[in-house]
Amino acid sequence: MVSKDAMKLHSKQDFEERKIKIIKILSYLGLTYAVVGWLNEVLFHWSNSVLLSHYSEYIAIGIFGTYRVMVEKNPYTRKRIAVLTAMVVGFWGLLPYLFSLGEPALGYFSGKATWGRGLHTPMTLTFFLALLLVVLFGRRAVCSWNCPCVGTRDTMGDAFRQKSIKSEATWKLRHLKWLLTGVYFILFIAVLFPFSKTRIIVDNFSGMVGVIYFGSFLVIPITGNRNWCRWLCPYGGTFGILNKVGLYKIKADREKCISCEKCNKGCDMGIPVRDFVETKGQVNVVDCVGCGRCVTTCPVNALRFYDVRDRFRKIPPPEKGGLLDDEELDEKGVRIKAFIAEL
C-alpha cells in the first residue's frame, strides 16, 4: 500500500512536470510572438500597431524577464536578469519609442541612429562607448547586461537551457560566426562612404541578419537558448575580439578545483571551462559572454571575475555566488565534504 507521503511526493512531481511543460509552451509562444511582430513590420504589414512590430520582442522580454527575476534563486543571476530586462525594455525599447533621440554617427548613419539601437550600429557614439566598456569589463558589459539578443535567450529561452548541445563538434562550430562578423567589418568600412551602393550593403546586411536572428528563435527548443550567441552573432564576434585582448577574464584557483565539471554544465555557450582551468588557470576566450553561470555554480568558489577594477585592488576579493556562499571553507577537505553533501 502506497503511503500518504509517497502519494504527496508523486503528486508534487506531477505538478512540477506540468508546470515545466506549461512554461515551455508559454515561452515558445513568446518567441513566436516576437517573430510575428518582426515579420509584420518588415514583410507583411498586417497591422500598424506597435504591438506587432520589432517592439514585440521587447514586450515579451519585459513579461518573461519579470517572471525570471521572481523565480531565479541565485542572487547574482537574479540581479543580472533584472538589469538586463530593465535595460532592454528601457534603453532599447521605451527610450527610442518615446523620444526620437539622434546621436552622433559617421558616414551613412549620420542623423539616423538612435540611442539604444545605436549600440549595434557601427560608427555611432554608443557603439564606440560599447567597445570601450568591453575592453575594460569584458563582453559581459554588453552581452550579459544590455543586449536584447541575450534578453530573449535568458528570459523566454531559459526554459530550453537544458537542450543546449554541448560537444567537441559544436564547440568547433563557434567559428561560423566569423562569416557574419566578416560581413559586419565590411559594413563598418562601407558606412564611411555615404553613396547609393552603401545603402544596398547596409540594407542587405540588416535583412540577412534579421532573417537569421529571428529564425533562430524558432529552433531554440532543439538547439538550446544560446544558438545565436554561440554560432552566428556578428556583434558577439566583434566584441569577442576585444573580450580576448582586453582586461576581462575569469580567473581560477586550480588548488580549489575538484573537477566536478559543474562549470561545464552551467555554461550555455558550451565553453570547456574545466579544460581551461586545468591548462591555463583562467578562461579568456572570445566566446565568453560573462553570464557568470560557471562562477555561481562552482561549489568551491574556485572561479572569479577579473576586469579593470582589479588593476586597482591590492588583493582581488573572491566572487560570491557559488552553492556554498555562506560557509567558511578554509580547508580543502571541508570543501570536498560539503560538496559531496550537496550531491
Show where each model-derived region lies:
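Non-ligating segments of multi-cofactor redox enzymes
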Residues: 1-277, 281, 286, 301-343
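Cysteine-rich micro-motifs
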Residues: 288-292
